[in-house]
């Protein structure tokens, strides 16, 4: 049997991390078994579905590199197929037309609730032989079995049973002729030959209804696996108040897709004590049996740790392709300065996100108008004038511009003046970067470049001279 899974989001908003984890688990299961992964857009909610949401879902899937083998399919383009199946069910007697008014259904609901009963349709039209005009408004309901139970072996949770007496005669076509969500899902899974449905636990109550419809159609019933919800670190359901929940927001915040995928796969699944997984390792090791039944707690600090790990372990050239977007957001012109791959090597240890990296790299490419006030007050004092003049002259004398030779020039300055490296290094750092913090000074000065470094030292000397004149 060829394994076939699907990810079927509703385009009523962005792709959130819960949906992304479900997509990842479905994708991994298909890849692990050499099967196929289908992308299906469940856009039957015409009022809430938007083109922007569809684009956001596609963007998120593409950014995570969760490629699909089929699709994207759109339910709104398959209404003719759904209605044809409903008509066949009406002919076969597994569905019926219901003419009950909204007022009657509301009264029925109130009476049942007053008695402490679960609100459900009482089947009045199921057993009615009243004649109705062809144009009289009606819905179509599925004739759910009235006895027995539905049992399915959830691949994560084990056997789950629902009594058919607890299930309603589900509306499968509205009065306007449009098919309903639960019915469309069934026909899609049947037509697309889905073997395993992996989805959130909020769909558990839909499963027995969908199984009964599949059986009424004599269609194969897929295996089901319901993934537990994701909570915030406070134990409450993950929401915007816990920070970013949109996949693309994590991109915007400077996370690498590898970090988010690694974090999401471990958010409810484990393989021993291993924390770091390549994509290939995920595919090789993933199984539904190792997915937890319990809710998972989202921990942003752990995700940040993973992101820092991947910034420093993935190829700098690859990380640079993602950094480029953030550089563009900061409007930094990188034509005159180090290659972005070199920048990743320079700032990787200091920066936990690519956004932070982009926001702290401007001095490598563009001149700054003023020095950081606190750093200048502390380090660009008259006592720093001589070390800056000497190190400037030694840097100017370098013919082979390298980080090693820059280091020798700084060391030689300290030796000549018989002062510690800090007496030379700190004023030099503020002079060339405008700030009091940077990566190692030799590689920083080397990356900034000879001409630009000397110009900035002269600017710092001018700042010191002006400061002296005011004393």
UniProtKB/Swiss-Prot annotation:
Sequence motif: 'HIGH' region, positions: 9-19
PROSITE patterns listed in its UniProt record: AA_TRNA_LIGASE_I (PS00178)
Family matches, as Gene3D superfamilies: 1.10.10.350, HUPs
Catalytic activity: tRNA(Glu) + L-glutamate + ATP = L-glutamyl-tRNA(Glu) + AMP + diphosphate
GO cellular component annotations of the record: cytosol
Record: residues binding Zn(2+): 98, 100, 125, 127
PANTHER family found in the cross-reference section: GLUTAMATE--TRNA LIGASE, GLUTAMATE--TRNA LIGASE, MITOCHONDRIAL-RELATED
Protein name listed in UniProt: Glutamate--tRNA ligase
Name of the gene encoding the protein in the UniProt record: gltX
């Amino acid at each position: 049997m060829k394994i076939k899974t699907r990810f079927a989001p509703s385009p009523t908003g962005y792709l959130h991390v819960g949906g992304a984890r479900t997509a990842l688990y479905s994708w991994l299961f298909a890849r692990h078994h050499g099967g196929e992964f289908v992308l299906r857009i469940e856009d039957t909610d015409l009022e809430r579905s938007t083109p922007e949401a569809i684009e956001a879902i596609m963007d998120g899937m593409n950014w995570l590199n969760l490629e699909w083998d089929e699709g994207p399919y759109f339910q709104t383009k398959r209404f003719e197929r759904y209605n044809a199946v409903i008509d066949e069910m009406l002919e076969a007697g597994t569905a019926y037309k219901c003419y009950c008014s909204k007022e009657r259904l509301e009264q029925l609901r109130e009476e049942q609730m007053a008695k402490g009963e679960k609100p459900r349709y009482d089947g009045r039209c199921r057993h009615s032989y009243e004649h109705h005009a062809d144009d009289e408004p009606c819905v179509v309901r599925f004739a759910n079995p009235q006895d027995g139970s539905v049992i399915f072996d959830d691949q994560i949770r084990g056997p789950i049973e629902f009594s058919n007496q607890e299930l309603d005669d589900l509306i499968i076509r509205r009065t306007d002729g449009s098919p309903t969500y639960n019915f469309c899902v069934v026909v899609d899974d049947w037509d697309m030959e889905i073997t395993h449905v992996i989805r959130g636990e909020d769909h558990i109550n839909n499963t027995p209804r969908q199984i009964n419809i599949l059986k009424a159609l004599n269609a194969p019933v897929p295996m089901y696996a319901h993934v537990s919800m994701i909570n915030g670190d406070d134990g409450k359901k993950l929401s915007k108040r816990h920070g970013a929940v949109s996949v693309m927001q994590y991109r915007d915040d400077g996370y690498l897709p590898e970090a988010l995928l690694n974090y999401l796969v471990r958010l409810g699944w484990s393989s021993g004590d291993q924390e770091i997984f390549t994509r290939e390792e995920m595919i090789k090791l993933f199984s539904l049996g190792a997915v937890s039944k319990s809710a998972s707690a989202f921990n942003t600090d752990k995700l940040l740790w993973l992101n820092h790990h991947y910034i420093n372990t993935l190829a700098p050239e690859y990380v640079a392709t993602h950094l480029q977007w953030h550089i563009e957001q900061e409007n930094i012109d990188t034509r005159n300065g180090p290659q972005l791959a070199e920048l990743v090597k320079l700032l990787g240890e200091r920066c936990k996100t690519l956004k932070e990296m982009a926001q702290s790299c401007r001095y490598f490419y563009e001149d700054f108008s003023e020095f950081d006030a606190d750093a200048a007050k502390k380090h660009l004092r008259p006592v720093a004038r001589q070390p800056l003049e000497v190190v400037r002259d030694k840097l100017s004398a370098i013919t082979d511009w390298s980080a090693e030779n820059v280091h020798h020039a700084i060391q030689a300055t300290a030796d000549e003046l018989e002062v510690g490296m800090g007496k030379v290094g700190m004023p030099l750092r503020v002079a060339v970067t405008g700030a009091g913090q940077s990566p190692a000074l030799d590689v920083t000065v080397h990356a900034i470049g000879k001409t630009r470094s000397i110009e900035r030292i002269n600017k710092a000397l001018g700042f010191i001279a002006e400061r002296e004149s005011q004393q």
